[in-house]
A protein has these predicted regions:
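Class I SAM-dependent methyltransferase SAM-binding "motif I" and its flanking Rossmann-like core
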Residues: 136-140
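Generic structural signal for well-ordered alpha-helical scaffold segments
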Residues: 17-25, 48, 52, 85-89, ...
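Short beta->alpha linker loops
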Residues: 7-8, 38, 104-107
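Glycine-rich N-terminal segment of FAD-binding domains in flavoprotein oxidoreductases
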Residues: 26-52
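Non-catalytic beta/alpha edge segments that cap or flank active sites
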Residues: 3, 14, 18-19, 26, ...
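N-terminal glycine-/serine-/threonine-rich phosphate-binding loop
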Residues: 1-32, 110
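Ligand-binding beta-strand-loop-alpha-helix segment within the catalytic cores
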Residues: 56-130
Length: 140
């Protein structure tokens, strides 16, 4: 584990985006673990800027998100799938079929969680995980 101290949110976003993009350049078919919420928004903006400039290619990348709200489908504007589509996936050249968010509307949530764990294992694990830390101390 490596800790990087930064002076402000913009610097954090720039450094986090650079690390993620470096991972993609180093391993074009990498698996990224992604998070939602306000913490990663700046990072996602910086990634989108780099992608728009042609500095990084996400076409072979897979993503696995942390979580989803139970009872919300991906078209609901409060869902994490909607958040990711709006704030990152539609702004970079990632194959949407390689973006994974748990199904919050699954009939059997335990089976959905087990299938999601299997997906992570079948993907070879997560190469780089992005997490946020909230003001209340939560991580995720």
């Amino acid at each position: 584990m490596n800790f990087i101290k930064v002076n402000n949110y913009d610097e954090l976003s720039t450094k986090a985006a650079a690390l993620i993009c470096a991972q993609v350049v180093m391993k074009p078919n990498c698996v990224l673990g992604l998070a939602t919420g306000s913490s990663p928004l700046g990072t996602y903006e910086k990634i989108a800027e780099k992608c728009a400039k042609g500095e990084v290619d996400f076409s072979k990348v897979s993503s696995i998100n942390l979580d989803e709200y139970v009872g919300l489908d991906g078209t609901n504007d409060q869902s994490y799938r909607y958040f990711m589509n709006t704030n990152l996936f539609t702004k970079i050249n990632i194959d949407v079929t390689k973006t994974n968010v748990p199904n919050g509307c699954a009939a059997d949530l335990k089976a959905e969680c087990e299938a999601y764990d299997a997906l992570i294992a079948q993907s070879g694990g997560i190469d780089l995980q992005l997490l946020g830390i909230g003001l209340d101390g939560h991580i995720g």
